[in-house]
Amino acid sequence: MAENTPKPAAGTAPAKPKPAAPGAAKPAAPKAARPGAAKPAAKPAAPRAAAPSGVYKKPPVDRPDPNPFKDSKRDAVAGWFQERFYVLNPIIDYLKHKEVPKHALSFWYYFGGLGLFFFVIQILTGLLLLQYYKPTETDAFASFLFIQGEVPFGWLLRQIHAWSANLMIMMLFIHMFSTFFMKSYRKPRELMWVSGFVLLLLSLGFGFTGYLLPWNELAFFATQVGTEVPKVAPGGAFLVEILRGGPEVGGETLTRMFSLHVVLLPGLVMLVLAAHLTLVQILGTSAPIGYKEAGLIKGYDKFFPTFLAKDGIGWLIGFALLIYLAVMFPWEIGVKANPLSPAPLGIKPEWYFWAQFQLLKDFKFEGGELLAIILFTIGGVVWLLVPFIDRQASEEKKSPIFTIFGILVLAFLLINTYRVYAEYSMLK
């Protein structure tokens, strides 16, 4: 059927489309391309403006917020500190999630904190005593008399310092043996044991160097006897001369003991203590072997604030005991040291050296002192390396041989300490 639309004649140009009338509707937009149809080519990106010749333009860097905790809800004071010390927030959060196991032997954990508490008391009272003490042969004893009689509450300050030193060492011994018998030194806590034992040795060094500072008769002759012992060992005479500042105990010895007591030893203790506490926080507190498998763990205390609050209660009890001992059982000043006078009866070191002192007395035969020093050295090295030797404990197995070894060491210390106490009590 023929169409009615006329075709253009051959040779004639096609008719141009008529322009749309004003107000007429615009032609409809082209429909979206069907799926699979070829997409039109993307327009090329506009070229970046060239930087001035010879000038490097640093590209922008997306930096994280330096303080992600600044918008957290805290009171004004806490928020102020949090905004300035925000790097400590992860540490605080870690301590909040740290837990300590609860069981029948958990109370032994608190003796380490008591030792730290008495060490802080030592620092505070020592700094106050340092304001009046004069470390010279002529003025040392007189300065103690001045502190005792003229300084307001000076007598109490001196007694607190003396008693806190003894209580600190006692707490450290208890902490060490409780750690040993619970096998808390086992893997991965070997370095906690090593650093703790080094802290005990440094604390004994505090006791030895501080004993001479009052410059009284007992302290003078006890130091003379104590510094004689290393002479029998190879190189011991040279070491003793350095410690004494000369061939005999004198004013130079007092000065050197003072510098060791207030400068060198505190610095070493702070370094080792920081390492020890860091390891304790990282590795945590271990329960005795087999307690977890036997269901003897009663639960867990949050280190902060639960365990720390219980620690604080122990500190308050320890402080009350310290004040009671300082007031009711004061340490005597004694008589000023006279190097030319004969040694009085009853010369002995402090109680924490009595076991070694008794062994030296028992080994009075030729070469006995050297043998005693060798035994002390070997015993100390073995005690230090127990975590690395006791492989059964590292495998969470009981090690009765090391338990017996610890009982023998404890018995040696207690029996010989009592022997010295009994002997010298009869001389009074």
Curated annotation (Swiss-Prot):
<feature type="binding site" description="axial binding residue">
    <location>
        <position position="276"/>
    </location>
    <ligand>
        <name>heme b b566</name>
    </ligand>
</feature>
<keyword id="KW-0679">Respiratory chain</keyword>
<feature type="transmembrane region" description="Helical">
    <location>
        <begin position="110"/>
        <end position="130"/>
    </location>
</feature>
<keyword id="KW-0249">Electron transport</keyword>
<feature type="transmembrane region" description="Helical">
    <location>
        <begin position="401"/>
        <end position="421"/>
    </location>
</feature>
<feature type="compositionally biased region" description="Basic and acidic residues">
    <location>
        <begin position="59"/>
        <end position="72"/>
    </location>
</feature>
<dbReference type="InterPro" id="IPR027387">
    <property type="entry name" value="Cytb/b6-like_sf"/>
</dbReference>
<feature type="compositionally biased region" description="Low complexity">
    <location>
        <begin position="1"/>
        <end position="15"/>
    </location>
</feature>
<dbReference type="GO" id="GO:0022904">
    <property type="term" value="P:respiratory electron transport chain"/>
</dbReference>
<feature type="binding site" description="axial binding residue">
    <location>
        <position position="161"/>
    </location>
    <ligand>
        <name>heme b b562</name>
    </ligand>
</feature>
<feature type="transmembrane region" description="Helical">
    <location>
        <begin position="312"/>
        <end position="331"/>
    </location>
</feature>
<feature type="binding site" description="axial binding residue">
    <location>
        <position position="175"/>
    </location>
    <ligand>
        <name>heme b b566</name>
    </ligand>
</feature>
<dbReference type="GO" id="GO:0009055">
    <property type="term" value="F:electron transfer activity"/>
</dbReference>
<keyword id="KW-1133">Transmembrane helix</keyword>
<feature type="transmembrane region" description="Helical">
    <location>
        <begin position="369"/>
        <end position="389"/>
    </location>
</feature>
<dbReference type="InterPro" id="IPR016174">
    <property type="entry name" value="Di-haem_cyt_TM"/>
</dbReference>
<feature type="transmembrane region" description="Helical">
    <location>
        <begin position="193"/>
        <end position="213"/>
    </location>
</feature>
<keyword id="KW-0813">Transport</keyword>
<keyword id="KW-0479">Metal-binding</keyword>
<feature type="region of interest" description="Disordered">
    <location>
        <begin position="1"/>
        <end position="72"/>
    </location>
</feature>
<comment type="function">
    <text>Component of the green S-bacteria bc complex, which consists of the Rieske protein and cytochrome b subunit but appears to lack a cytochrome c1-equivalent. This complex has a comparatively low redox potential.</text>
</comment>
<dbReference type="GO" id="GO:0005886">
    <property type="term" value="C:plasma membrane"/>
</dbReference>
<keyword id="KW-0349">Heme</keyword>
<feature type="binding site" description="axial binding residue">
    <location>
        <position position="261"/>
    </location>
    <ligand>
        <name>heme b b562</name>
    </ligand>
</feature>
<dbReference type="InterPro" id="IPR036150">
    <property type="entry name" value="Cyt_b/b6_C_sf"/>
</dbReference>
<dbReference type="Pfam" id="PF00033">
    <property type="entry name" value="Cytochrome_B"/>
</dbReference>
<keyword id="KW-1003">Cell membrane</keyword>
<dbReference type="InterPro" id="IPR005798">
    <property type="entry name" value="Cyt_b/b6_C"/>
</dbReference>
<keyword id="KW-0408">Iron</keyword>
<keyword id="KW-0472">Membrane</keyword>
<dbReference type="InterPro" id="IPR005797">
    <property type="entry name" value="Cyt_b/b6_N"/>
</dbReference>
<feature type="transmembrane region" description="Helical">
    <location>
        <begin position="260"/>
        <end position="280"/>
    </location>
</feature>
<dbReference type="Pfam" id="PF00032">
    <property type="entry name" value="Cytochrom_B_C"/>
</dbReference>
<feature type="transmembrane region" description="Helical">
    <location>
        <begin position="162"/>
        <end position="182"/>
    </location>
</feature>
<feature type="compositionally biased region" description="Low complexity">
    <location>
        <begin position="21"/>
        <end position="52"/>
    </location>
</feature>
<protein>
    <recommendedName>
        <fullName>Cytochrome bc complex cytochrome b subunit</fullName>
    </recommendedName>
</protein>
<keyword id="KW-0812">Transmembrane</keyword>
<comment type="similarity">
    <text>Belongs to the cytochrome b family.</text>
</comment>
<dbReference type="GO" id="GO:0046872">
    <property type="term" value="F:metal ion binding"/>
</dbReference>
<dbReference type="GO" id="GO:0016491">
    <property type="term" value="F:oxidoreductase activity"/>
</dbReference>
<keyword id="KW-0997">Cell inner membrane</keyword>
